Amino acid sequence: MHTNGNSCCATWSVRATIVTLSVYHLLVLPGKNIFFHTNPWPLKYADSIYFFLIILFALHRSNLKELGFSVKGLKRSLFIGSASGGVLVFSLFLLDLCIDSTGMANHDLFKNQPNLTISSEKNSIIQYAGLVLVIPLIEQIFFTGIIYQSIHKKTSPILAIYASGIIYSLAGYKLSLGSFGLGFTTSFLFKTTKTIYASIIFHVSCAVGEIMIKTIYPRLNTFLGFLF
């Protein structure tokens, strides 16, 4: 049996992971996509609410440290997460600059790409704050702090990291390279730092990057469309 030092969520078994993911994919996700998408906002976030309830149950059986919130090596984890996320966000600027410098901006694919504006209304601000802060936090605790660690207990780190990437990409019935890369990278960061902080920061950076593509760099929608 493989262990992960002080960070394995020992109370969460692979069997519990299978049951948790089965309920999510067979009940929660179909319900959200079929029945809940036109209902009040709490039901639109049924998946996040489900993740949150599972997190509360996991915390009842363990503690924050076992889910990855250890203060050991905190500065290193924050640096690695910030550096990884910073590289991702800065790469958007470089890619957009590349479109201009190579002349691709004159191609029909990159013309007439409208910039979306971020509304200053209170509801919009709350929505963006949720997308950038709350959702990454909940998803990382669930997918990395709980699911990845339970898989890591029974298999090698490499297989666990790849499995986490696949599971995350399937979480929304949307098998994409971007989703797989996010799940893979956050699990790898967790394995590297032994904490969840770097994974959360990187996920936040991805959420910020997605908003930047929609609002500041709309041409990258075409350039990076294969990822999503």
At which residue positions do the language-model features occur?
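Alpha-helical transmembrane segments of multipass membrane proteins
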Residues: V23-V28, Y50-F51, S84-L92, C206, ...
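Alpha-helical transmembrane segments in multi-pass membrane proteins
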Residues: T11-N63
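Residue-level signature of transmembrane alpha-helical entry/exit and packing/kink sites
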Residues: C9-T17, K44-S48, G73-G81, N123-Y128, ...
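Juxtamembrane/transmembrane-helix boundary motifs at the membrane-water interface
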Residues: Y24-K44, G103, M212-F228
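Short, Lys/Arg-rich, polar N-terminal cytosolic tail immediately upstream
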Residues: M1-A10
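Juxtamembrane helix-loop-helix connectors linking adjacent transmembrane helices
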Residues: H37, E66-I135, L220-F228
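Non-cytosolic membrane-interface motifs at loop->transmembrane helix junctions
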Residues: H37-A46, F110-K111, F184-F188
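Transmembrane helix-loop-helix hairpins at the membrane interface
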Residues: G86, E121-F228
